[in-house]
Swiss-Prot record:
Biased composition range(s): Basic and acidic residues: 521-541, 695-705
SMART domains for this protein: DEXDc, DUF4217, HELICc
GO cellular component: nucleolus; small-subunit processome
Taxonomic classification: Eukaryota, Fungi, Dikarya, Ascomycota, Pezizomycotina
Entry-linked PANTHER family: RNA HELICASE (PTHR24031)
Role according to the record: ATP-dependent RNA helicase required for ribosome biogenesis. Involved in the release of U14 snoRNA in pre-ribosomal complexes. Required for pre-rRNA cleavage at site A2.
The protein's name in its UniProt record: ATP-dependent RNA helicase dbp4
UniProt xrefs under InterPro entries: DEAD/DEAH_box_helicase_dom (IPR011545), Helicase_ATP-bd (IPR014001), Helicase_C-like (IPR001650), P-loop_NTPase (IPR027417), RNA-helicase_DEAD-box_CS (IPR000629), RNA_helicase_DEAD_Q_motif (IPR014014), SPB4-like_CTE (IPR025313)
Keywords recorded for this protein, A-Z: ATP-binding, Helicase, Hydrolase, Nucleotide-binding, Nucleus, Ribosome biogenesis, RNA-binding, rRNA processing
Residues where ATP binds: 90-97
Length: 804
């Protein structure tokens, strides 16, 4: 018999090893949780090993060559490990990506998150390129974890993403595609989400993504940890309320710094007229062929035109272009090539302005003025990253200089002015004109670039910087190689709007001149000769007044249309009454025959006739309805039209004692004063109503959310049933049909037609006399029908025939 301490072999040894390993993992996890709870937030950390991090995270950081913490990482990671909401703000290139990726991995690891737990962390990025960059860093740092991570951006197959989305624990995505999956993917749930991260939060929370982000947040649970990171962080209460942040920790490591940009960045600006911008840019590229440069423009059409034009001119350095209209594969190839290149020029829109980490960028050129100081900070942040050196140049038109410098000064951005040497400046205006003349496509691109630039200036909100009327657009079009400035509709619309809103006095200043009068007369005569279209408003103004006061007005005017003099004497009135109209009779009126010599008899008879024609109908109203015309008679037939003549109904409410009261009753003055001051009562009433509406709004939102959730669950249940049915149909195996031997045991019914059988054909064979006849012969076609098997004797005879 083996001793008690002998080592175990086989199945028992493996199970004991698994038990020990599980026990060791649980002990490490409990100690890690205890270290996080004991973490001092005021302590400063310098290395990643000083933080309470798990072994897989430390191994991933070490393999990716991350050893020391940056300022934003040192302060933000400790708060995030504690589960607090964070608003992180730091300069560009300070390592904000790791500041939120490490807490995401650690918090899910401590909760032992697995595939069946669903989505645990959601990371939103404003651009596809930044999302790809975050995902690559996540893959490097989290390579030793067992989480499933996914990248969800536009430009890829939706069905492929839908099949894999339900199995993901961490998602890096753009807002638009994420909302599409939340609405359409049945097997994707976010009810168990633990963390929400917004990189470049100020860009995501602005007007461009507002509706999309609100819709995404509506799908997420309120009990979650939320982290916002950006170089220019938002502090708006409305934005924070939309994200349901709970006592967020504001981490701004460079808030007290002298400048908002890195100290290793040299920043300059050049004042140049708009038509000379391309000439100076070409001269700059030609003089810096051994450097890596990014050129920012305001629109994608400008990027395409400048890229195509400079590509034809061949400056002697690789040229690339990046804008939002490109397909996802092309954008990814361009960013990869530019990252790997040592010397290149990239023409780009603001797609590349935020978050992208291009290594060893020497120059950032802003050919067009940025919309605000925040955009400037993000653009120049593509260089001078991680304490490297970098240089930036801003091109400003003379009309933009004062306003932009003022905005940069408010954001603590130091910029120095430099001048361009005249002997190094080269003009490419004639070459561009020659190329546009020979190539219609390039000319078309130039026209579109001109229009898009003018439109980008026109839509800017800061009119202190962007003054469209001060720009020399004709010369700018000529500098692009165009024969003339294209027509722009919205500028013409502004002129017509100004003419329309001009005061009338200004419009009539020139009416005293004889020449203008003659021109007006000619225009009027032309208008009279031309056929005019009469509208319903014209017919309305031509209609005669049928109001009650029409008769009084006719008495106030003379026969020639002039107003009667109210200060005239009675004698003048008597003279006028001599031939004035006293009464009008219709043709065939009986009163003409009777006549009347005196005014009194006429007036009496008129009153009598009036009394005969007038009817009075009492309805439920304040005053009776007078029927004095056929129109009023028709009015009696319409209940709908009579409603406005009837009084409004009164609604009564009953108190607890059963006494009837009107809905709105006026209080006595003493009762009103007993309740306090009027302003205090007003404040109390407004507060009570606000609280009531707030509670009702919460209930309504919860009801709508519940209905939406139920509808989505029903739709997902239907899709699950369809998927299950498809899987069952694929797994079903068809049974083979029964053999002929089994069929021969049963006799066919009388209704069925007799089925010929190969075995039944043998019944025609008779015992052969010779061997040759016994040999099997080919079956011949026979018109005779086979004999049916009806009795047991027929079956026996068939069997004997088969046995021979």
């Amino acid at each position: 018999m083996a001793p008690a301490n002998a080592p175990r072999n086989g199945k028992y040894a493996k199970s004991s090893q698994r038990t020990l390993k599980r026990k060791r993992v649980q002990e490490d996890l409990s100690s890690l949780v205890q270290r996080v709870e004991d973490l001092d937030l005021k302590e400063s950390f310098k290395a990643f090993t000083d933080l309470p991090l798990s072994e897989p995270t430390l191994s991933g950081l070490s393999a990716s060559h991350y050893k020391t913490l940056t300022d934003i990482q040192s302060r933000a990671v400790s708060h995030a490990l504690k589960g607090r909401d964070i608003l992180g703000a730091a300069k560009t290139g300070s390592g904000k990506t790791l500041a939120f990726l490490i807490p995401v991995l650690e918090n899910l690891y401590r909760k032992q998150w697995a595939e069946h737990d669903g989505l645990g962390a959601l990371i939103l990025s404003p651009t596809r390129e930044l999302a790809i960059q975050i995902f690559e860093v996540l893959r490097k740092v989290g390579r030793y974890h067992h989480f499933s991570a996914g990248l969800v951006i536009g430009g890829k197959s939706l069905k492929e993403e839908q099949e894999r989305l339900g199995k993901m624990n961490i998602l890096v995505c753009t807002p638009g595609r994420m909302l599409q999956h939340l609405d359409q993917t049945a097997l994707f749930d976010t009810y168990n989400l633990q963390m929400l991260v917004l990189d470049e939060a100020d860009r995501i929370m602005d007007m461009g993504f507002q509706k999309t982000v609100d819709a995404i947040i509506g799908h997420l649970p309120k009990e979650r940890q939320t982290m916002l990171f950006s170089a220019t962080q938002t502090k708006k209460v409305s934005d924070l309320a939309r994200l349901s942040l709970q006592d967020p920790e504001y981490v701004a490591v460079h808030e007290a710094a002298a400048s908002a940009t890195p100290s290793t960045l040299q920043q300059h600006y050049v004042v140049t007229p708009l038509p000379q911008k391309l000439d100076i840019l070409w001269s700059f590229i030609r003089s810096n062929l051994k450097s890596k440069t990014i050129v920012f423009l305001s629109s994608g059409k400008q990027v395409r035109f400048v890229y195509e034009a400079f590509r034809h001119l061949q400056p002697g350095i690789p040229l690339m272009h990046l804008h939002g209209r490109q397909k996802q594969g092309g954008r990814l190839d361009i960013t990869t090539k530019y990252s790997q290149a040592k010397h290149a020029v990239l023409f780009s829109t603001d797609v590349a302005a935020r978050g992208l980490d291009f290594p060893a960028v020497d120059w950032v050129i802003q050919l067009d003025c940025p919309e605000d100081a925040d955009t400037y900070i993000h653009r120049v942040g593509r260089t001078a990253r991680y304490e490297r050196d970098g240089r930036a140049v801003l091109f400003l038109d003379p009309s933009e200089e004062q306003g932009m410098l003022k905005r940069l000064e408010q954001k603590k951005v130091p910029v120095e002015k430099i001048n361009v040497k005249a002997n190094k400046q080269q003009s490419i205006k004639n070459q561009l004109q020659n190329m546009c003349f020979k190539d219609p496509e390039l000319k078309y691109l130039g026209q579109k670039a001109f229009i898009s630039y003018v439109k980008s200036v026109y839509v800017q909100k800061d009119k202190e910087i962007f003054k469209l009327k001060d720009l020399d657009l004709e010369e700018f079009a000529s500098s692009l190689g165009l024969p003339g400035a294209p027509r722009i509709k919205f500028i013409k619309g502004d002129d017509t709007k100004e003419r329309k809103n001009a005061p009338r006095a200004v419009a009539h200043l020139s009416s005293d001149d004889d020449e203008s009068d003659a021109e007006d007369d000619e225009k009027k005569s032309k208008k009279k000769d031309a056929p005019q279209v009469r509208t319903k408003y014209d017919r309305m103004f031509e209609r005669r007044n049928q109001d009650v006061l029409a008769g009084h007005y006719t008495k106030l005017i003379n026969d020639d249309g002039t107003l009667a003099d109210p200060k005239a004497t009675d004698e003048a009135d008597e003279d006028n009454d001599f031939l004035s109209v006293k009464r009008r009779f219709d043709a065939g009126d009986k009163q003409l025959e009777v006549g009347g010599s005196s005014d009194e008899s006429g007036s009496d008879s008129e009153a009598e006739t009036g009394k005969k024609d007038v009817k009075v109908v009492n309805i439920d109203g304040k005053e009776p309805l007078v029927i004095d015309s056929k129109r009023r008679e028709k009015l009696l037939k319409s209940k709908k039209k009579l409603l406005k003549f009837k009084g409004k109904g009164t609604k009564l409410i009953y108190d607890d004692e059963g006494n009837a009261h009107e809905i709105y009753e006026m209080e006595d003055e003493e009762q009103f004063r007993a309740k306090g001051d009027a302003k205090e009562q007003q404040a109390r009433f407004l507060a009570a109503e606000a609280e009531r509406t707030r509670l009702a709004d919460v209930e309504d939102k919860e009801l709508v959310k519940q209905k939406r959730r139920e509808k989505k669950e029903k739709r997902k249940a239907r899709e699950r049933e369809l998927l299950a049915q498809e899987e069952q149909e694929e797994m079903l195996v068809q049974l083979p049909p029964p053999e002929d031997d089994d069929q021969g045991r049963f006799s066919p019914s009388e209704d069925e037609a007799p089925r010929p059988s190969k075995k039944q054909r043998v019944q025609f064979a008779e015992p052969a006399e010779s061997e040759e006849e016994r040999r099997p012969k080919k079956p011949k076609k026979s018109t005779a029908e086979p004999k049916e098997i009806q009795t047991l004797e027929d079956l026996e005879s068939l069997a004997t025939g088969l046995l021979g």
